[in-house]
A protein has these predicted regions:
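Beta-sheet-rich non-transmembrane sensory/scaffold domains
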Residues: 17-23
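Gly/Pro-rich cap/lid or specificity-loop segments adjacent to the active site
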Residues: 23-231
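Sec-dependent N-terminal signal peptides
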Residues: 1-3, 17
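Bacterial signal peptide processing site
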Residues: 11-14
Length: 231
């Protein structure tokens, strides 16, 4: 109920101070930016291509997987609510797929619920995959080392895992992080044809949301950051 009241009633002030490092929001023609297809139970699914490296105008692209649960009332629709479950390291598209079981009727009437698998995760392309045997690295590891030898063994194992990740995903890994994910969020907004969107993120999703709001304050209608990270 609190989330519904916050997002339905709140809007951001138009005189928000813009930090010097703030990225400039843009609008785009939404046509064909996301190729939505029906994926059952009133859901739409699609992909959006975004630059891997936002500093390179000739960058290759990565494809973000998105899901959308349409607002149940066209007359009461406010706009888009972008949602992220935190982590990081796993997809978030399930937050729209399970919208009917997660959000209040008020939110479902008022917003298109849009979720996505952040770059490198879930059904986004490419997805980071480091090994065929994750149990080898994590199931038998000692997460509470008591001796220097145990600590050294743990460090060696994690280094082996990290080296494998870079060997298999080196073209993408340097560009998987909070700032680029926040820029991806603005690309999603642009592709949806929205001037402003609302956001709900919890756990690490609060840090992602705060970064997005700092970079693109003029595009924030409202934001709910649940379980916020310690600044």
């Amino acid at each position: 109920m609190i989330l519904s009241l916050l997002l339905v009633s709140c809007s951001t002030s138009s005189d928000t101070e813009v930090p010097a490092s703030t990225a400039q929001p843009e609008t785009t023609d939404p046509a064909d930016a996301i190729s939505w297809e029906s994926c059952g139970d009133g859901l739409e699914c699609g992909y959006l291509d975004v630059p891997i490296d936002y500093t390179d105008e000739n960058s290759a692209t990565t494809s973000l997987y998105l899901t959308k649960h349409m607002a149940t009332s066209s007359s009461q629709r406010i706009g888009t609510l972008l949602v992220n479950p935190g982590g990081p390291g796993f997809g978030g598209s399930f937050l729209a797929e399970s919208a009917a079981n997660i959000y209040s009727p008020t939110l479902l009437k008022s917003f298109d619920i849009v979720a996505w698998d952040p770059r490198g995760t879930g059904q986004s392309i490419p997805a980071i995959d480091c090994t065929d045997d994750y149990d080898y690295f994590f199931a038998g590891g000692d997460i509470t080392p008591d001796t220097d030898q145990e600590r050294a063994e743990g460090i060696a194992t994690y280094k082996e895992f990290t080296d494998l990740c870079f060997e298999k995903n080196g073209d993408l890994l340097p560009y998987v992080g909070t700032n680029n994910s926040a820029r991806d969020m603005d690309m999603i907004r642009r592709a949806l044809g929205e001037d402003k969107i609302s956001y709900f993120g919890f756990s690490y999703g609060s840090e992602l949301g705060a970064t997005w709001a700092t970079l693109f304050p003029d595009t924030v209608r409202a934001a709910d950051l649940d379980g916020a990270s310690d600044p």
